Amino acid sequence: MKDLARYRNIGIFAHVDAGKTTTTERILKLTGQIHKTGEVHDGESTTDFMEQEAERGITIQSAAVSCFWKDHRFNVIDTPGHVDFTVEVYRSLKVLDGGIGVFCGSGGVEPQSETNWRYANDSEVARIIFVNKLDRMGADFYRVVDQTKKVLGANPLVMVLPIGIEDDFVGVVDLLTRKAFIWDDTGLPENYEITDVPADMVDKVEEYREMLIETAVEQDDDLMMAYMDGEEPSMEDIKRCIRKGTRTMDFFPTYCGSAFKNKGVQNILDAVVDYLPSPTEVDPQPLTDEEGEPNGKYAIVSPDETFKALAFKITDDRFGALTFVRIYSGTLKKGDTILNAATGKTERIGRMCEMQADDRNELTSAQAGDIIAIVGMKSNVQTGHTLCDPKDPIILEAMVFPEPVISISVTPKDKGSTEKMGLAIGKMVAEDPTFRVETDQDSGETILSGMGELHLDIKVDILKRTYGVELEVGEPQVAYRETITQEVEDSYTHKKQSGGSGQFGKIDYRIKPGEPNSGFTFSSVVVGGNVPKEFFPAIEKGFASMMESGVLAGFPVLDVEVELYDGGFHAVDSSAVAFEIAAKGAFRQSIPKAGPQLIEPIMKVDVFTPDDHVGDVIGDLNRRRGMIKDQEAGVTGVRVKADIPLSEMFGYIGSLRTMTSGRGQFSMEFSHYSPCPNNVAEKVIADTKERNAKK
């Protein structure tokens, strides 16, 4: 039986280029999983094994690797930092027990760091902080620590102090032991010596050590009283308090170093062992009923329970179809039969393995706490599906993903590519819940939808290079929506008589604007039997089906509330079909009276620009209908936050590079829908109608 207290399921996440993947590489090197460390800038890293990742120097998928440190098993997930791939971060957080937040020593708390930190807070994932790249020009450990307080609202618990900075960075002082770890210039992680604290740092070390202990003992009233009386707690007691406060997210143990230069990585590994929780120390996953509502039961983390697991990632690589699974309860053995609770199908487990990024070790069994990959599942398993014991069917809390905001049309160039594309897209949709595909009913074109330009760019690249599909790609299209602005009280009667039994359904209703992000809601206040209750579902279905296409330009309709308050029926001619048709007619009749309005996706944009280009960048954002929300001066430039319509952001990366001589950076994520200005709405509606007329 494996000792779950020695398990650590952790994720590494941060902003693009803060050094997540390099940190992961160094962890694997130190734990003996790889013998030659690959470099991101050389396109050789272990966890970035897709062609697109190696070329772009960014992580797109979450790669899972297993390794060991001081008799503890680590399951490590290296997640993407680019906002278009935030879904990978989200679904990884769902199955992790702890994390390492990596921040750039010079860049500080960057936009995607903030987003990932917020997601981790929502998922209640305990973390340690690693301030990386202290050997870089402009690096400042203390400034980044301060930023984590101001920008993230975090409480960093400083555990080490840097010795030197930039080119003079040589190591760290461990505050608890008052020992200095100094590495030589060979770049080898094992080439370091432990010495006394440098004389010029003694006072600062004592100051920060006192703050560390004061914060830690707040977790234990007796220890705190003893400390206030002048008694220093034992090392064991301090570590116990730090572990407790880390698990409850009262603070975040904070380290520093240079992953690239192999300085300070051992301290992180020790911190993962000492302070991050094991699978048995986090809140168990809740179970739900078929409607997704919590039922008060939980997946207890124990190998003795019945099998319960969550499929959190589907991928197709050179080994075939892989389903990544976090086992919460029970044990899974080769040859066992399991149930996919979402599809109702059972399946016999053939092969399963633990992953070493793009390599794997075959397993005969796995248990609660493990993150594994099952090979070649046949039950149409998708991300978020619950896998369980057929004798004890359960449903784990679902994973919810954001809706796509941008679309492109793709057309295969020949028949061979058409067949390849169909197979490829089926696999890609299973792998990525934020990647959607539909066929335009009028033109027959295939429409790909995703989270941003880079997201779709990567998907098209995969279709072309991985699957050999020859494609013509259309211009990006914004996911406009329609809504209403006024309340309408109305009545509609559907009546049809053509020999034999006819059709009759009369409804009296109110249509009004719903709450933001409410979608479609239906309610009934009918008193008496004017409209029998058995017809309510048909009426709701009729209205809901019409929400897919609005009256302005055929865009889906958002945030509409329908209240049925009266109506009429015929004992012979009324039926569910008749009332469903009545509801559809009512929608067509009343929506034009309710002040229909075109709304557009607004993006939360975060731009970094050098000081000498701030005016140009802000002027450009204003021309893009941007609303500046905040400006924050940093050491190397200015960070500008703004809300900007997605339609104005196409090609922005090129414009920003031109304005800032290649030094500017930006990220964006969907924020909300907002009404289009009249001139914009008129043009969008006219262009859409013209485009539809040509189909």
Curated annotation (Swiss-Prot):
Q: Which UniProt keywords apply?
A: Cytoplasm, Elongation factor, GTP-binding, Nucleotide-binding, Protein biosynthesis
> CDD domains annotated for this entry?
EF-G (cd01886), EFG_III (cd16262), EFG_mtEFG1_IV (cd01434), EFG_mtEFG_C (cd03713), EFG_mtEFG_II (cd04088)
GO cellular component terms, alphabetically, are: cytoplasm
Which residues are involved in binding GTP?
14-21, 78-82, 132-135
Show the Pfam families listed in the entry.
EFG_C, EFG_III, EFG_IV, GTP_EFTU, GTP_EFTU_D2
* Segments forming domain tr-type G: 5-280
InterPro entries in the cross-refs: EFG_II, EFG_III, EFG_III/V, EFG_IV, EFG_V, EFG_V-like, EFTu-like_2, G_TR_CS
The membrane spanning regions, by residue number, are none
What family is this protein classified in? Belongs to the TRAFAC class translation factor GTPase superfamily. Classic translation factor GTPase family. EF-G/EF-2 subfamily.
Protein's UniProt name: Elongation factor G 1
Quote the gene name from the UniProt entry. fusA1
